[in-house]
């Protein structure tokens, strides 16, 4: 089995609405899991840095513009098996993908989650409890737990 390493960046985006904090989650079109917006670094622009990729992915998959609140990302790693070639190619066979994702805490600026791209079938802002119940993958739940600590250090002093 082939092994492939992937590095992605994304955003865990919050929005203050009345006295509540809402968080952006997306349902992926392909695997139907609920996730935070993220994507490969440098797949659309050569020499793209982690922050640029994270902001771009939030806009593409989440339909919103956001700003990075904390320069230090949360890192999560996991492995998954891909049947065929990741991201389009024609080479078949199973591939083991070792994925590392860097998530930045971000604050919503503008836009509507309904304006997401084709990779996402749904995107919405929800309360913290719903995020915890809705996220599909352990790595995203772990990232959210870490981001909440960073969020609290910035906003609940």
Tell me what each language-model feature is:
Residues 18-19, 30-33, 42, 74, ...:
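Short, charged/polar surface micro-motifs in flexible loops or helix N-caps
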Residues 20-65:
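Conserved Nudix-box catalytic region and its N-terminal flanking loop in Nudix hydrolases
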Residues 35, 98, 125:
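Short aromatic/basic micro-patch
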């Amino acid at each position: 089995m082939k092994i492939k390493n992937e590095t992605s960046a994304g955003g865990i985006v919050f929005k203050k609405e009345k006295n509540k904090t809402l968080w952006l989650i997306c349902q992926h079109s392909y695997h139907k899991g609920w996730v935070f917006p993220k994507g490969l670094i440098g797949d659309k622009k050569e020499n793209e840095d982690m922050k640029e990729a994270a902001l771009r992915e939030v806009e593409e998959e989440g339909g919103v513009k956001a700003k990075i609140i904390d320069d230090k990302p949360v890192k999560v790693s996991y492995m998954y098996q891909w049947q065929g070639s990741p991201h389009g190619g024609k080479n078949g066979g199973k591939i083991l993908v070792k994925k590392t994702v860097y998530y930045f805490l971000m604050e919503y600026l503008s836009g509507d989650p309904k304006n997401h791209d084709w990779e996402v079938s749904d995107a919405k802002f929800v309360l913290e409890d719903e995020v915890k119940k809705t996220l599909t993958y352990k790595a995203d739940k772990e990232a959210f737990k870490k981001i909440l600590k960073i969020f609290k250090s910035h906003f609940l002093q």
